[in-house]
Amino acid sequence: MKLRVLWVGKTQEEWVRRGIDEYAGRVRRYAPLEIGEARDEKGAAAEAMRARECERLDKLVPRTSRLILLDERGDQLTSPEFAAYISRCRDTAVPELAFAIGGAYGFADEFRRRADRVIALSRMTFTHQMVRVVLLEQIYRAFTIIGNEPYHH
């Protein structure tokens, strides 16, 4: 099963880029991973920004992918529950999981309706930059849980 992690906007901070590189490398030991960036929209009303950013994200998601949005209002899963979800997808021959992290104003309703699942990493708010690293770490953690490896205590 292939994984795709998509987000809006360039990664600004060097330490975030290092974290992305570290965890993307770890994830790739378990599954093919593609990372994609959609250009962020500037200088428009929030609704217009959401719509344009989601149009760009949508072009990066193959129709055969199972789309999972990261949103603070999504389902909260424990790490073992997240691992079980990934494992079920893999075991039922889902060809690809595509995770999308929205821009500053979130997702347009139309893109949200396309999603197969919406999850939250926490009830707390994170920067969109930070979520990139946290999501990749949780995907890596999920694979170590699936493999019964000692990373997750």
Curated annotation (Swiss-Prot):
It is an enzyme of class 2 (transferase). Keywords: Cytoplasm, Methyltransferase, rRNA processing, S-adenosyl-L-methionine, Transferase. InterPro entries: Alpha/beta_knot_MTases, RlmH-like, tRNA_m1G_MTases_N. It comes from the Bacteria. GO terms for molecular function: rRNA (pseudouridine-N3-)-methyltransferase activity. Pfam families: SPOUT_MTase. Its EC number is 2.1.1.177. It is found in: Cytoplasm. Gene3D superfamilies: 3.40.1280.10. One of its GO terms (cellular component) is cytoplasm. HAMAP family: 23SrRNA_methyltr_H. Specifically methylates the pseudouridine at position 1915 (m3Psi1915) in 23S rRNA. This is Ribosomal RNA large subunit methyltransferase H. The lineage of its organism: Bacteria, Pseudomonadati, Thermodesulfobacteriota, Desulfuromonadia, Geobacterales. The gene is rlmH.
